[in-house]
């Protein structure tokens, strides 16, 4: 029997863990699906230059990542246990050392946006190990792959019920929006879209921002831009901006939880970040 696109996926797909973005090897690639043709024209219809879009997809670095699609298709609810590794004396010591090393930048960001430096560092700790683990998946390839996962050639090979198929269609629409924003940003600033790597879900930089978050909350610490989320200064300022826009008030501890929850809709994540901030 002929193998389908996903029957060729290697067994033993990695267990998902959003906080372990760099621990896995990049997903293997396959030939681009036919659905990429429609995706390219969709991006052009929404305002991107046709030549730019076609050149990007025709680049030899452009690859379809079936493993990433499968991860999203069969996404499991995270276990609170995945955050236990952060609540240790060693991690707390690393956070305090980071606070001391980046004190000037943290204080400037905290003053400008009215947030707590300790919360910024706690988020950086969980998201990327203070910048040491930002992910290895090419961001363009992730979003391009996810953007077509609702196409018949792909979805038919996934054994999903009606609820699963509906969720996949919503995630594909989300990925198309994120891809549009990502390419718009790269084109506007003349950045190589293949130079960005991140998590299997497309989050990038030390702060693990999605392209839409980069657009709305990305801040250049020196005010010159473009924003580089793979630098400590810009990641710190961008997190501070995100928390501020999420309602963070330094003197209102209840607002801390609400703002951090806006960063990641997980009670266990919020508990971990707040606990680390208190330890710092």
Q: Residue locations for each model-derived region?
A:
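Bacterial N-terminal signal peptides
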Residues: 10-20
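Catalytic glycan-binding domains that act on GlcNAc-containing polysaccharides
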Residues: 48-280
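Sec/Tat signal peptide C-region and signal peptidase I cleavage site
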Residues: 23-29
């Amino acid at each position: 029997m002929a193998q389908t696109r996903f029957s060729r996926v290697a067994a033993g797909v990695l267990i998902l863990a959003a906080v372990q973005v760099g621990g896995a090897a990049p997903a293997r690639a396959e030939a681009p699906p036919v659905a990429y043709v429609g995706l390219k024209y969709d991006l052009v219809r929404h305002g991107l230059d046709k030549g730019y879009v076609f050149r990007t997809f025709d680049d030899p670095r452009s690859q379809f990542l079936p493993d990433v699609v499968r991860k999203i298709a069969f996404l499991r609810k995270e276990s609170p246990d995945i955050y236990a590794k952060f609540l240790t004396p060693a991690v707390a010591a690393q956070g305090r050392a980071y606070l001391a090393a980046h004190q000037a930048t943290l204080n400037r960001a905290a003053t400008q946006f009215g947030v707590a430096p300790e919360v910024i560092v706690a988020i950086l700790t969980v998201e990327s190990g203070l910048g040491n683990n930002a992910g290895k998946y090419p961001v363009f390839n992730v979003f391009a792959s996810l953007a077509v996962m609702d196409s018949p050639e792909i979805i038919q090979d996934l054994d999903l019920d009606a609820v699963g198929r509906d969720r996949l269609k919503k995630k594909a629409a989300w990925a198309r929006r994120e891809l549009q924003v990502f390419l718009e940003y790269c084109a506007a600033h003349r950045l190589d879209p293949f130079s960005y790597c991140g998590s299997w879900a497309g989050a990038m930089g030390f702060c693990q921002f999605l392209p839409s978050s980069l657009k709305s909350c990305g801040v250049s610490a020196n005010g010159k831009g473009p924003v580089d989320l793979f630098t400590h200064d810009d990641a710190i300022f961008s997190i501070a901006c995100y928390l501020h826009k999420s309602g963070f008030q330094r003197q209102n501890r209840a607002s801390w939880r609400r703002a951090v929850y806006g960063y990641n809709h997980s009670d266990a994540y919020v508990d971990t970040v707040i606990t680390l901030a208190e330890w710092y």
